UniProtKB/Swiss-Prot annotation:
The modification N-acetylserine is found at S2. The chain crosses the membrane at residues 235-255. It is a single-pass type IV membrane protein. This is Syntaxin-6. Residues 163-225 form the t-SNARE coiled-coil homology domain. GO terms for biological process: endocytic recycling; endosome organization; Golgi vesicle transport; intracellular protein transport; regulation of protein localization; retrograde transport, endosome to Golgi; synaptic vesicle to endosome fusion; vesicle docking. Widely expressed, with relatively higher expression in brain, lung and kidney.
Length: 255
């Protein structure tokens, strides 16, 4: 696994985008909850930027999902184990949940009503907004409290989710560490067995050389004995032929 892996490049961009989105979400919440009247342009700009940022993050997460599907289809080609894939899937799932929570907060009916109120205040101006706000203080005071409560719940959920991700990553790192230890022990055992086999092969080579030397000596002795046997046969044959020749000559002279 290389640091040039495109997953980590896109992951870094997604993390930056999430940080930006969380900052925009905090500012957007302050604009809606703040006692001071914000301009309509600022509210609209913050809302649009936040929505565009969340949409961009969702697209990047879809791209990361596709890369994981490709890796799962051919894991040997990319040399990624199941633990690394689980870590990547956990990052995508947690980030998608963060985006979903912010979108749910933005689309809540109470938040929409409060946003509409702020927009009306911005259009009517400070003086008219004060007169208009005096008649509906109770109604929007309740909406303010609901938004504050929802925002606090959102922050608590995000903190709990981040803690869960950290714990999952710690567990996965422990699994990876254990796997590395097992592989190290296996490599040491294999190395020891290879050394033993090398010693055995060396001993066998020496024995083979000794056997070959003894075999050469035996072959030389056999050749020498064979040569001596051949010479004796030749002398015997000559003696027999000489005797036969003498007999023939004797018979010839007698006759």
């Amino acid at each position: 696994m290389s640091m040039e892996d495109p997953f980590f490049v896109v992951k870094g961009e997604v993390q930056k985008a999430v940080n930006t989105a969380q900052g925009l979400f905090q500012r957007w919440t302050e604009l809606l909850q703040g006692p001071s009247a914000a301009t309509r342009e600022e509210i609209d700009w913050t809302t649009n930027e936040l929505r565009n940022n969340l949409r961009s993050i969702e697209w990047d997460l879809e791209d990361l999902d596709e890369t994981i599907s490709i890796v799962e289809a051919n894991p040997r080609k990319f040399n990624l184990d199941a633990t690394e894939l689980s870590i990547r899937k956990a990052f995508i799932t947690s980030t998608r949940q963060i985006v979903r929570d912010m979108k749910d907060q933005m689309s809540a009916s109470s938040v929409q009503a409060l946003a509409e109120r702020k927009n009306r205040q911005a259009l009517l101006g400070d003086s008219s907004s004060q007169n208009w706000d005096a008649g509906v203080t109770d109604r929007y005071g309740r909406l303010d409290r609901e938004l504050q409560l929802a925002n606090s719940h959102f922050i608590e959920e995000q903190q709990a989710q981040q803690q869960l991700i950290v714990e999952q990553q710690d567990e996965q790192l422990e699994l990876v560490s254990g796997s590395i230890g097992v592989l190290k022990n296996m490599s040491q055992r294999i190395g020891g067995e290879l050394e033993e086999q090398a010693v055995m092969l060396d001993d066998f080579s020496h024995e083979l050389e000794s056997t070959q030397s003894r075999l050469d000596n035996v072959m030389k002795k056999l050749a020498k004995v064979s040569h001596m046997t051949s010479d004796r046969r030749q002398w015997c044959a000559i003696a027999i032929l000489f005797a036969v020749l003498l007999v023939v000559l004797t018979l010839f002279l007698v006759l």
